[in-house]
Each structure stands twice: as structure tokens, then as C-alpha cells.
Amino acid sequence: MPDAVGRELPRDGTVLAFDYGEKKIGVALGNFITREARALTILPNITVEGRFEAVAALIQAWNPVQLIVGMPVNPEGGEQPSMKLARRFGNQLNGRFGLPVEWVDERYTSRAASMAGARRGELDAEAARIILQQYFDQFPL
């Protein structure tokens, strides 16, 4: 996962973040100027082609310069099965769309989204928003 020390944030551009799940993918949007994230949508994750057609439509609409994928690390920091799926999804995003992908530790983001008052149908998008905000927050102003 990224280490912000010594790295600079791009000056401008849109960022899409994904909270990957086997059934649904939460999506958030932000940009490097405001460094604020907002929940965007939830994509159904039924077929591989359907998933990437939906992502392609978002990329075409928002023209991001960076993609972020939440990495579901277990509470002790170790590997868990869903990490492989999230890592594969991020690698596929990079391969299909040629955009840089970074992973962000998503521990407890779904719980935080629920505690923040996100309704049941909005949890995945709100979790993606939290993931993206964590990404922005790791860089000093």
C-alpha cells in the first residue's frame, strides 16, 4: 500500500475510488485540488464484462488521473482471501484503462460508513468515500 513520505500529490485531476465487493462495488469521486471525496454510486458486480463496462462509463464521464482501490486488510494487518480479489480488480483496472492504481487500507470503512449514518443501500459508496478521503488525508497540505 502507498507510503506518502517523499511522494507528491498531483496538482490537479479527478480520482475515482472503489470499495470492491463480490456482489457490489462502491465508488467515490474526488479531486486533487479540494482533496475532498464524495460517494458517487454503487455498481453491481455480477459479471466481469458488466463490471468493466460500468467502470468504463465512469472513466469516460469523469476522466480520472488516478484510481484508488480499498484493500481489505484483516484487523491484525494480515492477508485475507478478499485481498486477492481486490488486488486482482486493481490490477485489471490498470491493465484495461492504463491509469495508475493505488491501494488504501480499508479496515473498518464499512463500519465507519454505517456509524456515520449511511443507509443500507449507500454503505458501499460511503465506504469508498472514506477510502478516498483516507488517501487524500495522508498527504500534507
Curated annotation (Swiss-Prot):
Keyword Cytoplasm: yes
Protein's UniProt name: Putative pre-16S rRNA nuclease
Family statement: Belongs to the YqgF nuclease family.
Compartment(s) of residence: Cytoplasm
GO biological process: rRNA 5'-end processing
Species name: Cupriavidus taiwanensis (strain DSM 17343 / BCRC 17206 / CCUG 44338 / CIP 107171 / LMG 19424 / R1) (Ralstonia taiwanensis (strain LMG 19424))
InterPro entries associated with the record: RNaseH-like_sf, YqgF, YqgF/RNaseH-like_dom, YqgF/RNaseH-like_dom_sf
UniProt GO cellular component terms: cytosol
Pfam family of the protein (one): RuvX
Keywords: Cytoplasm, Hydrolase, Nuclease, Ribosome biogenesis
Task of the protein: Could be a nuclease involved in processing of the 5'-end of pre-16S rRNA.
Domain of life: Bacteria
Keyword Transferase: no
EC number: 3.1.-.-
An MF annotation (GO) of this entry: nuclease activity
